[in-house]
Each structure stands twice: as structure tokens, then as C-alpha cells.
Amino acid sequence: MAINRRTLLKSSALGTLSFAIPTLTLSQIDLGSATISTISDGAITLPGSLSFDSSMPASELEVILEDFDLSKDELTRECNLTLYQSGKKKVLFDAGAGVDFLSGMGTLVESLEAIDLSTDDITDVVFTHAHPDHIWGVLDDFDDLTFQNANYHIGRMEWDYWFDTETVNKVREDRIPMAVGAKRRLEALEGNINLFDSNDEIIDGIKALLTPGHSPGHMSFEVGK
């Protein structure tokens, strides 16, 4: 099937509709001796202006909205995290939104409990980037570290970007709280964080790949068996 903006948006809408009722553990697969789970951190509701392609003809968008009974004014999307378990390693990719970001998010702790894990069981937290829905969850509502026993890992470029004193001056005004919040949480991790570069194997079987754009130092990860 050819992938174009309509099929992509339609697939996105279907995924949102499928998980309209929050589910704590969405999927689980085995990869060799490892297990990879997709777990929920809740859902976020965004205005339609941020969710739908503004260049799409209105007639095309209307068909998709009608097919899936969606509003053009807003779209609710699931926020999910990945958990990699192999041997004694329990590696969480990103830390979720925590309690301070938006209503409806921050269900990660409950999702872990649903698979008989606690935050103390997490051995490593690996960040893709430092936007609020990916890193604010490192602190709990007492500003203590959520994952007390974990080692933390983030790309060097991403770390440097949020610690650059000019970043807060360069972002849009409405994104200043995001920049300040990212730096505050990264500061809480100083002394217990591993900075890595693209192509580094940061944990046995997990290789980092630089994929900038969404953020300057955004990382993706290749997971081996």
C-alpha cells in the first residue's frame, strides 16, 4: 500500500480510536531472550490545528473525520512507553510525563504495577529526548527521583542543548516553561547519567542512532536479541 498523508492520518486516527479506553499494557513481544512491552502513560488531547495536516484539502479531511467519528477541533492520542527486559535488566525508554504536565497523563507507575513491577525495579532509563511527555516523569510529586535505583542515559547533543544558556532565549515564548522544566529535571540527574553518542552501544544489545528533527539531539534505538 502506498503511504501518503491521507493513509498516514487515517492509520493514526484508527490507532487513537482503538485505544479510546486507556489500557495499561498495550502489547508485548519476545525478542530472543528479551521481552519488549508497550505500556501506557495515559493520553493527551491536542487541538485539531496541531493534529491535522493544514495543507490537506478540507474535503479529504472531512472523509477521515466522518469515517472514524472524530472532531476536527481536537484529537486524543495515547502516550506510550517501551520497556525492555532481558535478564536482570529492566530498561525503560523515557520516563513519561509525570504528575506536573497535563491532565490525563502520568499513568506510568500504575502501568508498571499492572505487570508486577515497581519503579524501584527499573535498572535503566534511556531518553529519546527531553520534551515534557518524555522526561518530566523522572521526578515525583515530592521532587524526588521516581526511579531510585536506575542508571540514566541521554544523548550528548540533547543534554548540551538543554544546558545551553541560550536555549531558553531562542525558543518560542510559549515553550520557555518546557525548556526550564527540561533543564531542572536533567539537573536532578547530574552525577548519575551517562552521555552517549550516535552508534554507541549504551547497554548490551541496545544501540543509539541519532535521529534529529523533533529535537536537536533526538535518539532512536536499535534493539538486538
Please identify what each model-predicted range represents:
Residues 1-3, 7:
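Secretory targeting signals
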Residues 7-26:
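N-terminal export signals
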Residues 28-115, 220-225:
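Conserved beta-strand hairpin/beta-sheet module of binuclear metal-dependent hydrolase folds
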Residues 93-94, 124-130, 154-155, 210-213:
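Active-site neighborhood of phospho(di)ester-bond hydrolases with catalytic His/Asp-centered motifs
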Residues 97, 132, 217:
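Short, glycine/acidic-enriched loop or turn micro-motifs at the edges of active sites
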Residues 103-153:
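Active-site metal-binding motif and surrounding structural segment of the metallo-beta-lactamase
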Residues 106, 113, 121, 148, ...:
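Metallo-beta-lactamase
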Residues 209-225:
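Active-site-proximal loop/helix segments of hydrolase catalytic cores
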